[in-house]
Amino acid sequence: MAFILSIGTSLPVYDVNQEKAAEFARYMFQHSFKDIDRLLSAFKNGQIHSRQFVKPIEWYKEEHSFEEKNQIYIEETLKHSREAVRECLSHPDFFQEAIPYEKVEAVFFVSSTGLSTPSIEARLMNELPFSPYTKRIPIWGLGCAGGASGLARAAEYCKAYPEAFVLVIAAELCSLTFQPEDKTKSNLIGTSLFGDGVAAALLCGEKADRRVSKLKLAPKIIDSQSVLMKQSEDVMGWDFTDQGFKVIFSRDIPTLVEKWLKTNVQIFLDKHQLSFRDISVFLAHPGGKKVIDAYIKSLGLSSEKLSSAQSILRKHGNMSSATILYVVKDHLQNGNKKEAERGLIGALGPGFSSELLLFSWEKGA
């Protein structure tokens, strides 16, 4: 059992609305598709209003080497991770006083949009006053499922060490993977969806001292479930080229969600003798409008139970693994909470895979 006590976030400064993003896509792809106007409707109909990027949109019109893009990834990810962690450990909405860095026993660092060895959390520990004995657990390659998986693995750590405080950092700079020479439909659709963002969550075990928490009710993680769909590597992921990360993005993802997810959720709920009616809220990774629609149709949920996911999609688009932490933060600050009510945290990612967490609202301090 583990509690989510706080979430901090950090966004790049370059805010791009969908109209401007569609103009960019037209410039980049107009000579590659005869039906470009139809394809560009994805920008208008995707329920995304704006996204944030680490570079001005004009920068992405030119080719950049993988070396250049990855160096930017390291620098910007470190900067935004630092800001997200600082906010997470001292957010006035969540704490009466800041949590000392040396209290953090382990750091899970999650990403899939760049490479760094030593990994980013090691660089972060050189810039912030963490204990040198802090355990480092980098997780790479889970894509959009990574944030939920990071929460699940951190909760398992807290179960083993119930007095521990643990950080989960999810950092994704999706825009740096854009390849202007890639004129595929997958790249165009990806251009309509993905944005950049970093988030950090603080979890603690049941026996940790939570007296500084301001939360009247906090999510207490009860259990998690990981599921892999076999022989589905081609649904989403990366091809690695001389230019960097080339997106793999199947158009069948919403259909797969609709057909595959319900059974997995049902098995998870059955394990705890629960039904869909017992779930008050679904804090889901909003992969896109069609994915949210598939959640609603497949699980028979009301749109209201996915309101935080829809809100984050509108404001920031799909930030891969970081997105789910933004969704949880939105609900912590703005959502309805009632003691002992249960909810789900969920995300889907490369594999093709599903990560689910069951939680209940319990007294935070």
Give a label for each model feature:
Residues 112-114, 131-133, 138-159, 258, ...:
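Claisen-condensing/thiolase-fold acyl-transfer catalytic domains that form or cleave C-C bonds
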